[in-house]
Amino acid sequence: MARYTGPKAKLSRREGTDLFLKSARRSLADKCKLDSKPGQHGRTSGARTSDYGNQLREKQKVKRIYGVLERQFRRYFAEADRRKGNTGEKLLQLLESRLDNVVYRMGFGSTRAEARQLVSHKAILVNGQTLNVPSAQIKSGDVITIREQSKKQVRIAEALSLAEQSGFPTWVAVDAKKFEGTFKQVPDRADISGDINESLIVELYSR
């Protein structure tokens, strides 16, 4: 299954919430109607969405937020289910610990897609070593750095400047002048932003 490459705003409208696929710092709320479905006038339906439909919709939303395809998402859920604790919370923690997401949270990319591209293009160092696997799991204490040659990229500087203005998550420490950040710890559920109801995903996979 290929990644979606169409209009990002359409995906946010489909889910009824801003997925921040275009920018983490600029909301789409002022640009388009997030409470209406894609289409000329917004498709409507008189039928009430079933429990299964709501569960499936929530899974699709989270997949789109993190840019993960179905097979990989199932693997994340299976791993979360094996771990002790709340399965839904563990799932989100695994997704948040992906290298591309950490690069995004540190403000080096304005979106997760842009952060993923930086990783794939070998612009990212982890503990001083090039790592070009977006799905790599980052551990507490790992240091993320922009490769020296890539520090000149205007898009990185602009994304970092915007991130500084809006603030960084508490579970990362960023030195913008050095283009460097430290993954302090796996975030608690309360530290993970986003309008996500992970319990619906757990219910879906428990059917």
Swiss-Prot record:
The keyword Lyase does not apply. Residues 97-160 form the S4 RNA-binding domain. The keyword Ribosomal protein applies. GO terms for cellular component: small ribosomal subunit. This is Small ribosomal subunit protein uS4. Residues 33-54 are annotated as: Disordered. One of its GO terms (biological process) is translation. Residues 42-53 have a biased composition (Polar residues). The gene is rpsD.
